[in-house]
Amino acid sequence: MPRVPDAVSYVGRNVSDCGYCASPDASVSDGAVAHGLSTKRYGELIDDGWRRSGTWIYKPAIDVSCCAQHTIRVSVDAFRPSKKQRQVLRRLDAYLRRERDEGSDGGDEDGARAARKLEITTARSTFVREEFELWKRYQAAVHGDEASELKEASFRRFLVDSPFVEDETPNETSEPSIGLGAFHQQYRIDGKLVAVGVVDILPKGLSSKYFFWDPEYAKLSLGKVSALKEIEFVADERRRRPEATREFEFYYMGYYIHDCQKMKYKADYAPSELRCSTTNRWVPVDDADVQKKLDAREHCRLSDEAALPRECCEPLKSMVGLALRGQLVSVTTLGDLPGLLESIGVNLGSSRGVRRFADEQAEWCERSGRAGMTIMNLVDIERNLLAYEDSDEVDEHSDDELAGIA
């Protein structure tokens, strides 16, 4: 069966140990399994505070989490590299220009010494064995991961899989030249793979997901180089195709965490702005008042301006996809759900299952914002509706069957 566009299975709120400050059971987020999403819909989710890891999408709950995570982006047209960032590029350039030491003069027939060559290529996300081997070396050397933990399945799930449903032929009038979706950018020096950038190319800009590099090239600061090259990618597209890329103007860096030094550096790419989760406004991260609020841990409201209207789907009009034993049965609205279930012979008895699901659907509508108006929430009749009739506990089985129909 073809993948279902704009469909998720909302899981709800999740509490886990924090990966930034290591506090136990202190990181809180809302999550969903994304079976299929257009890049436009995912872009709307990003602007509402969501992010993805493979096909898992999540939104940190800033008001109750230990480390407040704010979506951060840069307007590429306004970006100017700092002195330190220019030094990073000069260091790379000096390395590339330096004569290669290959045990010989390395020259051509005329005796000239050849410089190194850096090539950056962008291709749609797919599993590449060479990338996987580089990722394992990076994770072991930089993050201290055990070799036994570095599985191909984890690499695929985290860095290759995506929920995007896109036409691979770019729209010449309204998209970047390479198209939209999930991509890997390979960095090669003289043909050797030295780094990989995992990015999403969305209607409004490039979203940087992950970057890994060869530990032998640590002195080149390739992580900083990649951010500058990704910004340059957006700028180049805007220069070459101004009409097609009028909205393609931002560089998204994921989340900014003011209290975490390894995440705070993102504000160095200036001028950058943070999303205020209360007012739905974007505020300059270097604004004095914003900095005071961040220093005082007043994370919920970064802007003193009035809140912008936030569109949300009316729960009874929201879309619900019904699955039964791994097959999509029907698509309906929450308001029409009870009648549809009766029409296909599903006896809900007290209907407690539908009422409980209705509460979860209302929560999804509120937390997904505008994007949720056109995203279907896929639910399994037996595991998620009928299960509620016999138990007060939420069924926590995997979403493998739902993933199979999407």
Regions found by a protein language model. Give the residues of each.
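Generic alpha-helical structural element
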Residues: 7, 30-34, 120, 124, ...
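A eukaryotic "domain-start" boundary segment
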Residues: 1-46, 51, 59, 63, ...
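Active-site/acyl-donor-binding loops of N-acyltransferases
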Residues: 72-74, 242-307
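Residues that form generic nucleotide/phosphate-binding pockets
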Residues: 44, 48, 137-141, 158-161, ...
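A general structural signal for short secondary-structure boundary/capping elements
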Residues: 166-169, 233, 297-304
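Extracellular/mature segments of secreted proteins
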Residues: 25-31, 73-76, 308-324
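Acyl-donor binding region in acyl/amide transferases
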Residues: 25-44, 52-53, 179-182, 190-273
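A conserved beta-strand-loop-helix scaffold within acyl/acetyltransferase catalytic domains
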Residues: 53-56, 60-64, 72-219, 318-398, ...
